[in-house]
């Protein structure tokens, strides 16, 4: 496994030099709705991506239709592979599994892999589950606990560093948490 730190432009040039074309993400399928799903869908639409959301809860679907009028909202169970096929999972550029159940998210992500979805992201609440599925073809496993812990750690470090005239803006954990990359705001 290789980890690279570079600007977006440098990464594009790097992959082009290797002959690996990085396709732009245009169609994103989000499975499951919560605060993160709404925020993500809003940001993706702002970036001119088409967003399709599948959600079990009818009331949430109605609310999303009002909040995200340009998104396609589907009332249904995203763990139903027939529904995913009907909704064109094979033509999605990315699938994001954000239900409240780790197992459902992992199953959807693995099914997306069989459908050759180029980018697959699944949210898990238990770090042990993230470790179990590593290497199974899911591009990104996002641990809710790790993201929260990183945000708190970043805040604490920013408060500590503010005395020394530099604030930590962003904290990234890489290589299974063995490496940290910090983005600082330096004041003159």
Task: Identify what each model region corresponds to.
Residues 1-188:
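Cytosolic regulatory regions of ion transport systems
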